[in-house]
Amino acid sequence: MVLEDLGKRINGAFANLSKGGDIDEALDAMLKEVCSALLESDVNIKLVSQLRQKVKNSVKATPNGASKKKVIQKALFDELVNLVGVDESAASAAKFKPQKGKSNVVMFVGLQGSGKTTSCTKLAVYYQRRGFKVGLVCADTFRAGAFDQLKQNATKAKIPFFGSYTETDPVAVAAEGVAKFKKEKFEIIIVDTSGRHRQESELFTEMVDIGAAVKPDSTIMVLDASIGQAAEPQSRAFKDASDFGSIILTKMDGHAKGGGAISAVAATNTPIIFIGTGEHIHDLEAFSPKQFISKLLGIGDLQGLMETMQSLNLDQKKTMEHIQEGIFTLADLRDQMGNMLKMGSLSSIAGMIPGLSGMASSISDEEGTRRIKRMIYILDSMNQKELDSDGSIFKEVPSRITRVARGSGTSIREVEEVLQQQKMMASMASRMGGKNGMMSRMQNAQNNPAQMAAAQRRAQQMMGGGAGGMPGMGGMPGMGGMPGMGGMPGMGGGMPDMSALQGMFPGGMPDMGQMMNMVQNNPQMKAMARSMGLGI
């Protein structure tokens, strides 16, 4: 059972709890379904049994007059977080915070085939996109082709690398590579070490020797999520031999035992800092237990979305100014499309937005990215006068559409769809702009961490009906106008607090069911959603 299916099963159990009837019977049925789903995901039976008992104990302690349903929902959420998390002191101690202007050495360890070399490149890209000067060192002299693999990955990602085809001593290669990058003032130096097919003593000796030579600021173990519960003894064995501080769990995107692997690692009290969610170099997500469970249950991860946007330093200043004036040009649309590609996969972004998580499975990341790129080709084929316009120039001179289609290698229909999307965004911008517009109200709420935390808590309290149908769960306004669900124009300044958005709708914010009906019943919105790769 992949994690997506696990989330659906748990959400289905929540939905049954909301149907009414005897609450105690509903609790037993819900726990039976949740525990069954966890066991199928290879979570240890002892851990599942403990979760069931802790939830029941929390419900028994419910004070008179309190809502049992809310207590059950909160208790299960908290216990799921505890299942995949470690205590705060261990997480804080292992948290790697690289400093700019200083050389930070990171050493990777793990068994062969765990995805270690690929994860090295992913982490390098992760920090490179955040402004760090990153270098890769291949100290894996055991596996044939290891240096070629790292070289290929690093070249594709445009990351400087170091390795040797002739030197067979991994300690010498590691020391030389780290010394070279330190001399050249690299800020993050990632050392890839050798792996083995099993836990051999030579591997552990080699890890200790390399660690002594390069003196890493952080040692990360890479584990394959497909091994499920076996992650616990494997991580304990490595922990005893090399005192690594944290773990990257790979292959979380398509294996049935991902949940079991996470809970098994958590049982060792070793924090997971990243999870690999795909084969591409950008498919690496920072791991937070609360945010992970929130996304799993379809609640979204507003905090994670904000952190992603802020860490990438997306340039939204010009678009923000236009929105405040009630304007949205074709150039603004091009900027938004570019920012979408920088943020990562569409399904990952969808998973961070409350209520849209359930739609993530209908998005093919490859197809969505392809369509966004084609939209950018179309916009890049326009001249500056056209880009600075509101699109009406194409209506006045229709031959421009044909010229742009030919120049971009696309069809007239695709150009018209881009113009239609810009028109819808411009219409939204006109409603949002001005002193009394939505943007003005949003700015009063954004950039406020306390309000953001409160918004996430409110989302958690609305878990009753599962993703896409949580009772009373507010959807994001104007979903049809969000470029590929990347967010409202100007969202780079921070997501607005949900309570602030509530006040902008006199009748209350529409839930996701209502919003989907709006899309289905509006041909323009439906066409635009399809153009973005949504299965609508």
Swiss-Prot record:
UniProt xrefs under NCBIfam families: SRP54_euk
Family: Belongs to the GTP-binding SRP family. SRP54 subfamily.
UniProt cross-references to HAMAP family, sorted A to Z: SRP54
GO cellular component: cytosol; endoplasmic reticulum; signal recognition particle, endoplasmic reticulum targeting
Assembly information from the UniProt record: Fungal signal recognition particle consists of a 7S RNA molecule (SCR1) and at least seven protein subunits: SRP72, SRP68, SRP54, SEC65, SRP21, SRP14 and SRP7.
Record's function text: Signal-recognition-particle (SRP) assembly has a crucial role in targeting secretory proteins to the rough endoplasmic reticulum (ER) membrane. SRP is required for the cotranslational protein translocation for ER import and preferentially recognizes strongly hydrophobic signal sequences. It is involved in targeting the nascent chain-ribosome (RNC) complex to the ER and is proposed to participate in the arrest of nascent chain elongation during membrane targeting. SRP54 binds to the signal sequence of presecretory protein when they emerge from the ribosomes.
Alphabetic keyword roster: Cytoplasm, Endoplasmic reticulum, GTP-binding, Hydrolase, Nucleotide-binding, Ribonucleoprotein, RNA-binding, Signal recognition particle
Pfam families in UniProt: SRP54, SRP54_N, SRP_SPB
EC nos: 3.6.5.4
Catalytic activity from the UniProt record: GTP + H2O = GDP + phosphate + H(+)
SMART domains: AAA (SM00382), SRP54 (SM00962), SRP54_N (SM00963)
Higher taxonomy: Eukaryota, Fungi, Dikarya, Ascomycota, Saccharomycotina
Compartment(s): Cytoplasm; Endoplasmic reticulum
Swiss-Prot/TrEMBL GO biological process terms: SRP-dependent cotranslational protein targeting to membrane, translocation
Gene3D superfamilies registered for this protein in UniProt: P-loop containing nucleotide triphosphate hydrolases (3.40.50.300), Signal recognition particle SRP54, nucleotide-binding domain (1.20.120.140), Signal recognition particle, SRP54 subunit, M-domain (1.10.260.30)
Domain comment (free text): The NG domain, also named G domain, is a special guanosine triphosphatase (GTPase) domain, which binds GTP and forms a guanosine 5'-triphosphate (GTP)-dependent complex with a homologous NG domain in the SRP receptor subunit SRP101. The two NG domains undergo cooperative rearrangements upon their assembly, which culminate in the reciprocal activation of the GTPase activity of one another. SRP receptor compaction upon binding with cargo-loaded SRP and GTPase rearrangement drive SRP-mediated cotranslational protein translocation into the ER.
Molecular function terms from GO: 7S RNA binding; ATP hydrolysis activity; endoplasmic reticulum signal peptide binding; GTP binding; GTPase activity
Protein name: Signal recognition particle subunit SRP54
Residues binding GTP: 110-117, 192-196, 250-253
Region (G-domain): 1-297
Recorded superkingdom: Eukaryota
